[in-house]
């Protein structure tokens, strides 16, 4: 995507990122801070989140706070408590990037282990839904809120062996579409499909692939910025590809 955002694109915006400790989420958190946002980091690993907050500060960004939430074990009550804690420090949320995700096993359907299947659904769908429910009141306080989910190519077209992960991403697309209709005119809701990107998850999914052939998280940030800022103000109910035209599957 060719997009040259204004340096102050996200000034006065408060943006929460899940899975902010690593990979694409870490890069998104750093990038949002560079464009002026006050960033709230959510994840399950305190040391990694603290390191991201420190980097934001070292780069001259606004001080960011981090909060621990393990999507694998979270309950609706834990999500409500998190929203409550956030509301003590912040008046509203202008953006939420649901980025945290779990891959599970890349094996045929008849070999998908039910406990791994349930973990993938819990992190990618159920936990993400519970957190969304808890954060909606804060998002609705913004006059230009943007709620962004993270999908995948296998969330739009099923592919052999992608099992629970693919099914969870179809569910993510559905959740986005339902919410986009329900909050039409109040909150925009979209998905990003990052496309193959050089992260730990990608290396686990394609261990034989040469990572150098992949875009880095930094390369795909233009779309992440565009969807959080006012340049995409009227867009809702859509899945956007961060790498349009890229053929899904292993990079040759
Ligand atoms: P990584 O594995 O590099 O990072 C995943 C992030 O999610 C980490 O911050 C991780 O935390 C966090 N996370 C995982 N499980 C939990 C949990 N139970 N509770 C809270 N946080 C959790 O993945 P990517 O950066 O590659 O992926 C980011 C998103 O993009 C995912 O939704 C993925 O499905 C999607 N995606 C990625 C593609 C790619 O090629 N990379 C392609 C298509 C979609 P921790 O640091 O503690 O492990």
Residues of each region from the PLM?
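C-terminal helical subdomain
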Residues: 185, 191-194, 199, 208-250
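Residue(s) in the substrate-gating loop at a strand-loop-helix junction
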Residues: 152
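Conserved glycine-rich cofactor-binding loop
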Residues: 14, 21-23
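Conserved glycine-rich Rossmann-like NAD(P)H-binding loop of the short-chain dehydrogenase/reductase
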Residues: 37-52
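Substrate-binding pocket helix/loop in short-chain dehydrogenase/reductase
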Residues: 82, 107-109, 113-119
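Rossmann-fold cofactor-recognition segment
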Residues: 59-74
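Active-site helix of classical SDR
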Residues: 132, 168
């Amino acid at each position: 995507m060719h997009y040259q955002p204004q340096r102050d694109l996200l000034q006065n915006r408060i943006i929460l990122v899940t899975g902010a400790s690593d990979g694409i989420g870490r890069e998104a958190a750093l990038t949002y801070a560079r464009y002026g946002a006050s960033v709230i980091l959510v994840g399950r690993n305190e040391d990694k989140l603290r390191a991201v907050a420190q980097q934001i500060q070292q780069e001259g960004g606004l001080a960011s706070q981090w909060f621990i939430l393990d999507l694998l074990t979270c309950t609706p009550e834990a999500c409500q408590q998190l929203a409550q804690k956030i509301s003590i420090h912040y008046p509203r949320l202008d953006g939420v990037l649901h980025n945290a995700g779990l891959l599970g096993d890349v094996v045929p359907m008849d070999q998908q282990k039910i406990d791994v299947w349930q973990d993938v659904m819990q992190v990618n769908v159920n936990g993400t839904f519970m957190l969304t429910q808890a954060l909606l009141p804060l998002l609705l306080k913004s006059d230009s809120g943007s709620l962004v989910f993270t999908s995948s190519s296998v969330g739009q077209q099923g592919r052999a062996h992608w099992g629970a992960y693919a099914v969870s991403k179809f569910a993510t697309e559905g959740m986005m579409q339902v919410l986009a209709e329900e909050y039409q005119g109040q909150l925009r809701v979209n998905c990003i499909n990052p496309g193959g990107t050089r992260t730990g998850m990608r290396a686990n999914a394609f261990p034989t692939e040469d990572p150098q052939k992949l875009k880095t998280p930094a390369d795909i940030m233009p779309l992440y910025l565009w969807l959080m800022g006012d340049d995409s103000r009227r867009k809702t109910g859509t899945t956007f590809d961060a790498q349009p035209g890229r053929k899904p599957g292993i990079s040759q």
